[in-house]
Amino acid sequence: MAASEVQGLPVDPREAGVRGVRGGIGHTDHEGHLGSFQLLATINKAAMNIVEHVSFLPVGTSSGYIAASSGITMSNFLRNRQTDFQSGCTSLQSHQQWRSVPLSPHPHQHLLSPEFLILAILTGVRWNLRIALICISLMIKDAEHFFRCFSAIWYSSDSKDCILEPLSLPESPGGTTALEGSPSVPCIFCEEHFPMAEQDKLLKHMIIEHKIVIADVKLVADFRRYILYWRKRFTEQPITDFCSVIRINSTAPFEEQDNYYLLCDALPEDRILREELQKHKLKEVLDQQQRERNDTSFHGVCMFCSEEFRGNRSVLLNHMAREHAFNIGLPDNIVNCAEFLCTLQKKLDNLQCLYCEKTFRDKNTLKDHMRKKQHRRINPKNREYDRFYVINYLELGKSWEEVQSEDDRELLDLQEDDWSDWQEYPVSAVCLFCEKQEETIDKLYVHMKDTHEFDLLRIKSELGLNFYQQVKLVNFIRRQVHQCKCYSCHVKFKSKADLRTHMEDTKHTSLLPDRKTWDQLEYYFPTYENDTLLCTLSDSESDLTAQEQTENVPVISEDTSRLCALKQSSVLNQLLLQGCLEN
């Protein structure tokens, strides 16, 4: 894409800023993802125009200096940032001003110039500013070249579109700006104030007028409180106590040298401040989410069938998911639901697809498109919706994809099992015939034998009961006692006390009925759900088998009295001697 192919661009670089960056480029006709390096080819070709128009640089700067500057450090660094690279390319693709270009046969050549970072900032699309800011801190030897590129852009453009970090696309389809009456944010050093929604202008003001760069502004949860904090701190101590200093024009005379200051989370105080702001923001989000959970005054209209819903927000969300297959997530994972639904409704009112965001001529065409293309859903890569999901507020600087992709198995493996807080509770098994409880099963067996003349261990041994038969027998006795019925004579009594008196007087506790009476499938189910006695029963069959194996298997000890004679008469020893004689 040559510079002459771009339509609608001013020729004068002072009016355009950078030639080949903005213009009336048509929207792509296909819906597939463009290749990453196709976009890099576009970036590189447009970035070359920066080199063509460096004649307007400040005094003492030559275009040859920029053209000859080494980009190897930048290239190596960016090759290691392939993930950030692909993310930026996806963002560029979603911008409606870009179109597909031929694939370059040598894609890595587009990494040889640092100017493409500046171009990405100027395009106004979402881009990972962290790359540019890390470059400032890591590439000290290239800092002069890097800041000369910045200066070239600032001095070359009189437009107000030149900003420090990437622009965000409008949050609403109409492209409206900030609400009137939004709080203003002061400059860190002077009395200039800017509306909260125009923080880009404040950042531009601070870097031009005061030569200070704030790293990773997008990761600051509360920008206004962040600025107010450092405004106070800079009045207490010099800026050099907090910021890294980068000197440009180092070879020029001293009066022409400039110092730029980088404020980033490498400073522990800045890191702590960002984390505290993030925690405060998370608390506000969770409080808002809890209010929405308990809110019963919600009123909303379905975006697809115009049916009205009142009560809790979950009623409307569940309706759209069930009836229209439009699922934006669980209600408990969403915050600011009313604003979220309003944003989606405005897109549909503007005849815009919720997934690919194409605009159609009428509502029927839009409905057919969303149905056939299965676009009745939101695009998870659209960062516009991130602020409506709680997961994006959990960790500082991490998106929902990064949080979900983390593998916690390694962390679980590294954690040692800690049993220091383990408390051993007594068994508290209950007698079969009365309410007596014992802490050990042995004591309970003794109690039933002495008090009720019921020897469960003897019965188990005489009848050869396995574990499952013991379970049936215990459950059978429990049920009969619960029904106040004697299992031997089948007489029913008014109370358990009368039943115990009868069974003890008649010695019926030890007179079990026939096996077919209690050895039934129905007695697999416990009479009492918390019957601890069932958990202490042993498998007599396995115990007996193990005991028989121990008794029947003979153990023959090794005879070591004739060990020397065995060695001399062994076949192996004879073969070895025969081999030696033959050799």
From Swiss-Prot:
<comment type="function">
    <text>Probable transcription factor. Involved in modulation of cellular senescence; represses transcription of the tumor suppressor gene INK4A/ARF, perhaps acting via the Polycomb group (PcG) complex PRC1.</text>
</comment>
<feature type="zinc finger region" description="C2H2-type 1">
    <location>
        <begin position="351"/>
        <end position="375"/>
    </location>
</feature>
<dbReference type="GO" id="GO:0008270">
    <property type="term" value="F:zinc ion binding"/>
</dbReference>
<dbReference type="GO" id="GO:2000772">
    <property type="term" value="P:regulation of cellular senescence"/>
</dbReference>
<comment type="subunit">
    <text>Interacts (via zinc-finger domains) with RPS2/40S ribosomal protein S2, perhaps as nascent RPS2 is synthesized during translation; the interaction is direct; the interaction is extra-ribosomal. Interaction with RPS2 competes with the binding of RPS2 to protein arginine methyltransferase PRMT3. Interacts with Polycomb group (PcG) complex protein BMI1. May be part of a complex including at least ZNF277, BMI1 and RNF2/RING2.</text>
</comment>
<keyword id="KW-0862">Zinc</keyword>
<dbReference type="GO" id="GO:0000978">
    <property type="term" value="F:RNA polymerase II cis-regulatory region sequence-specific DNA binding"/>
</dbReference>
<keyword id="KW-0479">Metal-binding</keyword>
<dbReference type="GO" id="GO:0005730">
    <property type="term" value="C:nucleolus"/>
</dbReference>
<keyword id="KW-0805">Transcription regulation</keyword>
<dbReference type="GO" id="GO:0070301">
    <property type="term" value="P:cellular response to hydrogen peroxide"/>
</dbReference>
<keyword id="KW-0158">Chromosome</keyword>
<keyword id="KW-0863">Zinc-finger</keyword>
<keyword id="KW-0963">Cytoplasm</keyword>
<protein>
    <recommendedName>
        <fullName>Zinc finger protein 277</fullName>
    </recommendedName>
</protein>
<dbReference type="InterPro" id="IPR013087">
    <property type="entry name" value="Znf_C2H2_type"/>
</dbReference>
<dbReference type="InterPro" id="IPR041661">
    <property type="entry name" value="ZN622/Rei1/Reh1_Znf-C2H2"/>
</dbReference>
<dbReference type="Pfam" id="PF12756">
    <property type="entry name" value="zf-C2H2_2"/>
</dbReference>
<dbReference type="GO" id="GO:0005694">
    <property type="term" value="C:chromosome"/>
</dbReference>
<feature type="zinc finger region" description="C2H2-type 2">
    <location>
        <begin position="482"/>
        <end position="508"/>
    </location>
</feature>
<dbReference type="InterPro" id="IPR040048">
    <property type="entry name" value="ZNF277"/>
</dbReference>
<dbReference type="GO" id="GO:0005737">
    <property type="term" value="C:cytoplasm"/>
</dbReference>
<dbReference type="InterPro" id="IPR036236">
    <property type="entry name" value="Znf_C2H2_sf"/>
</dbReference>
<keyword id="KW-0539">Nucleus</keyword>
<keyword id="KW-0677">Repeat</keyword>
<comment type="similarity">
    <text>Belongs to the ZNF277 family.</text>
</comment>
<keyword id="KW-0804">Transcription</keyword>
